[in-house]
Amino acid sequence: MIPDPRDIILAPVISEKSYGLLEENQYTFLVRPGSNKTEIKIAVEKIFGVKVTNVNTINRQGKRKRTRTGYGKRKDTKRAIVTLSPESKPIEIFGGPAA
């Protein structure tokens, strides 16, 4: 059973690299760490109504942070770089490519 698409896509990634990828019709999202590429593709197509051609994923290890009592660790995250088909409409969640 595929979970709700909004449980898979957590948030868009706002960074210099993700804004640069907008011109290549690629969008970067923070996704649930247990999700696979097929689930991510289906979720993006359902939420935004676009056609996805490719999904690349990145597993990022959480940073080690010092606390008052010793060391802790931020949680691990997973990012997905989603490539849309050329005839697909752009996703307006990022505000479009920077001009």
Swiss-Prot record:
GO biological-process terms attached to the record: translation
GO cellular component: ribonucleoprotein complex; ribosome
Keyword RNA-binding: yes
Pfam families linked: Ribosomal_L23
Gene3D superfamilies tied to this protein: 3.30.70.330
Record key words, sorted: Ribonucleoprotein, Ribosomal protein, RNA-binding, rRNA-binding
Superkingdom of origin organism: Bacteria
Sections of the chain in a coiled coil: none
Family designation: Belongs to the universal ribosomal protein uL23 family.
UniProt subunit comment: Part of the 50S ribosomal subunit. Contacts protein L29, and trigger factor when it is bound to the ribosome.
Role of this protein: One of the early assembly proteins it binds 23S rRNA. One of the proteins that surrounds the polypeptide exit tunnel on the outside of the ribosome. Forms the main docking site for trigger factor binding to the ribosome.
PANTHER family: 60S RIBOSOMAL PROTEIN L23A
Protein name per UniProt: Large ribosomal subunit protein uL23
